[in-house]
Each structure stands twice: as C-alpha cells, then as structure tokens.
C-alpha cells in the first residue's frame, strides 16, 4: 500500500541530497540564462499531484481511455486560458516541449524536402529553425536569413530570399535576438509568396502575454511557445492559432497526437493551467515590464564599461555580449562568472570566428533575476560585477570578491521566501 508519509529523504538520500543541493544552488547563484526562470509553488504543486498517474490519450471529450472526466476539466482550463492570454481561437497544450511543438507544426504543414525560411542559428535562431544537426535541417530544405551589420533583421533581404526560393513556410522567432520582430511585415512577405508564417515565440511569450512585446498570434498562421522561460510556468510547449481554420487545427492536433506523442502529461498540463492563470493577473504585467527595464539597465552599464552588445541594445529580456577582439572566449567568460555564482551561457555571435563549443559571446537574460525581485539598481550593480570579472577573468581575487557580493545580494532576494 502507498502511504502519504513516504518521502525521498528517507528512501533515497543520495537523490534527495542532489535535489537539496540544486535548491541551494538556485538560492545562492544569480541566474542569467535567458531561457530559465523560477516557477511558482502553485505550479509545482500541480506537477506533484496525482494527475501524474492518469493516461489520457486523445483530447477532451474524445479520449481513448475511460476515467478522464476530471483530466478533461484540467486540460480544458489550460486550453481556454491559453486562448484568452494570447487572443487565439485554437490552443493545443499537450506538447511536452517547445521543440516537440515545433516538430508538430512541421509535420502538419510540410512534407519532407519542402523549403523553409528560418533564422540562421549563428544570427540568433534556434536549433529547430533549420540547424543541420536538428530534424528540421535534416528533413527539410532550409534557407537561412539573418541580421544586418546593425544587428537588426534585414526585412528587405528576407523578402529577396523569400521571392528567390519560394519557401512553403517562413519561421519567425529566435533564441538570441534582442530586437523587436515585425510580425506584420513577415506575414506580408509570406502572403506575397503564398507561404505559411510560423512563429516560435518561446523566448518572449511572457512579454507578449503582458503586452510589452508585439503579439504574433494575429499575424501568423500558427504560433508555438514553451511554457517556461518568460512565461514562468512548467517545462512544456503549447501551439496557438487565430487563423479560424478548422482544417489547420485538425492537422495540428493530429500532428501532436498521434503524430508525435502518445499520452499527454496531465500533471504538467495542470501546471500550465496554473501558469496561464497567473499570467492573466495584473501583477504579471508589472513583472514583465520590469524584466525589460532590467535588461535595458544592464545594457546601459555594459556599454558604459566598453562592452559591445549585439544590435547595440535590447527591446526584450535578453542581450548578447560580443567578446570578439578581446582575449576572452565565451566559454572562459561562462566559467569565470560561474565561479562567482553568476550563471550565464556562452553563445555564438554574428561572424563568430570560434566554434559553437567555445564562442565569442555570452547570452544574458533577466527573467529569473526579476522574478526574485531585482530592479534596475540591482541589475546595474550586478552588471558592474560581471564587467569586473570579464575585465580580469583569470584573477581569483576578483572572482572571490564578486562571489561574496553575489551571496549577499542573493540573501537579500530569496527565490522562495
């Protein structure tokens, strides 16, 4: 018999210690990876519920198993809240991840070998937008577009490439681009050549939900997102559309199940429902505006200290620090900052002479620090410490000093108070 007082600490102390150590790491490290965030205890409560026991292949009202009357309620709540949040007429909350949501879109709209226009990974795109090591690059004919010398998307060049290659689908969205994307312009180009416009808004979904970044849903045929990152929900994916095209919706549903997945993760879908409800609250808008304010404050200090920011600034939650010309690789910067309890990720920058495993840049994002309460003053102070380390990355004394400052700041702003 299963008993409610069963726990990991007594049964599996080795695993429990790893979990405890990760909890401590999150409290004592400053998280600047742009794709990471802290989810709420309410979301974690949903994910730890008995919903994890339930198989529910199919969709609400059309399941292949019995006993789904309550998980139908859960999934319907998630669907309706997602639609409300983004102004969609269709939502599929079953994808296990953003990448699986993206693969479902490819499966629904394309055939292997079809031509796709996607943002170059080296210019800020994502693996699933056509990288040769990803399914998207292996199964489809990918034509990349990129950014100009100013670090902004070149829509004239995009249009020229689109007219020349006539892709069946154009992809908007990014994993490392700090500007505003003109979704309407992309739809205009797509319509000129009769292509689908697919937008992956994973990185900026929270900003979009709060109205501080343009919403692609009214412009794209289909939109995907993760539910973590700026949305601050559980790790997972979602597909949205406002195309009012029932045939398209059927294709998307079929591509998720049975096309790419079996049973949905009902405990995670419950977590998504909670996160969408949280994102509909007024304070979520305040949070997202602060995310952008903090990012702009950090850019200001980087520029003052002589560091180059790709595109010269940011209009969202992230920035790319360009280290080309400095005697410091992205990998070295990542490691040095990590030693001071500041977590970033090395990242390729445009025209990067180094490999993706070494890189000449670091990507920095503000969702997590804002979630724990940092405002502009703390963001600027932190950026100064980062610059101190980048200026002298091989100096243990500098790293140790900054680490002490980081620990003191983290103690003032606990993640879970």
Curated annotation (Swiss-Prot):
Q: Which reaction does it catalyse?
A: (6R)-5,10-methylene-5,6,7,8-tetrahydrofolate + glycine + H2O = (6S)-5,6,7,8-tetrahydrofolate + L-serine
User: Under which name does UniProt file this protein?
Assistant: Serine hydroxymethyltransferase
Q: Which InterPro entries match?
A: PyrdxlP-dep_Trfase, PyrdxlP-dep_Trfase_major, PyrdxlP-dep_Trfase_small, Ser_HO-MeTrfase, Ser_HO-MeTrfase-like, Ser_HO-MeTrfase_PLP_BS, SHMT-like_dom
One annotated Gene Ontology cellular component of this protein: cytosol
**HAMAP family noted in UniProt:** SHMT (MF_00051)
Specify the pathway. Answer: One-carbon metabolism; tetrahydrofolate interconversion; Amino-acid biosynthesis; glycine biosynthesis; glycine from L-serine: step 1/1
GO:BP terms for this protein?
A: glycine biosynthetic process from serine; tetrahydrofolate interconversion
Q: Which SUPFAM superfamilies match?
A: PLP-dependent transferases
Family of the protein in this entry: Belongs to the SHMT family.
Cofactor(s) recorded in Swiss-Prot or TrEMBL: pyridoxal 5'-phosphate
Q: Which residues bind (6S)-5,6,7,8-tetrahydrofolate?
A: 121, 125-127, 355-357
Q: Assembly and partners?
A: Homodimer.
What domain of life? Bacteria
Task: Identify residues that carry N6-(pyridoxal phosphate)lysine.
Answer: 229
Q: What is its EC number?
A: 2.1.2.1
Uppermost EC category:
transferase
Cytoplasm listed as a keyword: yes
């Amino acid at each position: 018999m299963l008993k409610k007082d069963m726990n990991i600490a007594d049964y599996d102390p080795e695993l429990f210690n790893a979990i405890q150590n990760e909890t401590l790491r999150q409290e004592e490290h400053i998280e600047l990876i742009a794709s990471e965030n802290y989810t709420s205890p309410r979301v974690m409560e949903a994910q730890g519920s008995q919903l994890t026991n339930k198989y529910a292949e199919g969709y609400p009202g059309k399941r292949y198993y019995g006993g789904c009357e309550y998980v139908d309620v859960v999934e319907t709540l998630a669907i309706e809240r997602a639609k409300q949040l983004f102004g969609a007429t269709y939502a599929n909350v079953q994808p296990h991840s953003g990448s699986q949501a993206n693969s479902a879109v490819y499966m629904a709209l394309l055939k292997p070998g079809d031509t796709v226009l996607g943002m170059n990974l080296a210019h800020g795109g994502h693996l699933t937008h056509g990288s040769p090591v990803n399914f998207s690059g292996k199964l489809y004919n990918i034509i990349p577009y990129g950014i100009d010398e100013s670090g902004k998307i070149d829509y004239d060049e995009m249009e020229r490439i689109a007219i020349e290659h006539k892709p069946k689908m154009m992809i908007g969205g990014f994993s490392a681009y700090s500007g505003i994307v003109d979704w309407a312009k992309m739809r205009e180009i797509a319509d000129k050549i009769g292509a689908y416009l697919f937008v992956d808004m994973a990185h900026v979904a929270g900003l979009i939900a709060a109205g501080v970044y343009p919403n692609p849903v009214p412009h794209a045929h289909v939109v995907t997102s993760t539910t973590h990152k700026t949305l601050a929900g559980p790790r997972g994916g979602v597909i949205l559309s406002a195309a009012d095209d029932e045939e398209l919706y059927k294709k998307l549903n079929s591509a998720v199940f049975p096309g790419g997945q079996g049973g949905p993760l009902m405990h995670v879908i419950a977590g998504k429902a909670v996160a969408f409800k949280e994102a509909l609250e007024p304070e979520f808008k305040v949070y997202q505006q602060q995310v952008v304010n903090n990012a702009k404050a950090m850019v200001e200090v980087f520029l003052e200290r002589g560091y180059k920011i790709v595109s010269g600034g940011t209009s969202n939650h992230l920035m790319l620090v360009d280290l080309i010309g400095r005697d410091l690789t992205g990998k070295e910067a990542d490691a040095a900052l990590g030693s001071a309890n500041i977590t970033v990720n090395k990242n390729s920058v445009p025209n990067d002479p180094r490999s993706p495993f070494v890189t000449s840049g670091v990507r920095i994002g503000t969702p997590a620090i804002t979630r724990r309460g940092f405002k502009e003053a703390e963001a600027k102070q932190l950026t100064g410490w980062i610059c101190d380390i980048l200026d002298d990355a091989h100096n243990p004394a500098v790293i140790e000093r900054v680490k002490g400052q980081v620990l003191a700041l983290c103690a003032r702003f606990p993640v879970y108070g």
